[in-house]
């Protein structure tokens, strides 16, 4: 798995400034040379074909959404945050990036690949889950939202972060 040059990179950005309290992207998904159904009547791009090879976010997003839907079907009690954390905590490493200079594979940073490449089967068996609500994003500093990633951005001298997890395999 590799991250292509046109992929978005982190850190998170809110439109005015970079936010160094959480990491983006969360994960990466397949998005290059994806065989997809196509309308043969379309005259704008490829005419007469029923399947074409496409790349970009339009191809990686359905992979991620499909993985999330499979997990929700298998675990109807999981919240969207639980599903996100399962995908993040079981993502596959290493993920490389393609060098724009010579096409060679280079190591990635967390700002290139997030937690790594999604692995729906591993996520299905995730042992620990994080949870948060939309209100947490509205009312808490980003560093205090119970995300599946922890990042110490701009720290003067000392900082503490904590996360709460629950077991997905054992119940009380």
Say what each PLM segment does.
Residues 1-172:
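Loop-rich non-cytosolic ectodomains and luminal regions
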């Amino acid at each position: 798995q590799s991250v292509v040059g046109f992929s978005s990179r982190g850190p998170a950005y809110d439109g005015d400034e970079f936010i160094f309290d959480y990491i983006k992207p969360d994960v990466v998904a397949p998005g290059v040379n994806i065989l997809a159904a196509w309308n043969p009547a379309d005259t704008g791009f490829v005419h007469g074909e029923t399947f074409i090879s496409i790349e970009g976010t339009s191809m990686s997003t359905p992979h991620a959404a499909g993985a999330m839907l499979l997990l929700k079907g298998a675990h109807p009690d999981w919240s969207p945050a639980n599903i996100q954390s399962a995908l993040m905590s079981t993502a596959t490493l290493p993920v490389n990036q393609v060098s724009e200079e010579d096409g060679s594979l280079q190591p990635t940073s967390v700002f290139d690949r997030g937690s790594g490449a999604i692995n729906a089967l591993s996520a299905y068996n995730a042992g620990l889950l994080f949870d948060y609500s939309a209100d947490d994003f509205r009312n808490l500093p980003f560093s205090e939202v119970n995300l599946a990633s922890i990042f110490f951005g701009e720290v003067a001298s000392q900082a503490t972060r904590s996360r709460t997890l629950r077991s997905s395999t054992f119940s009380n």
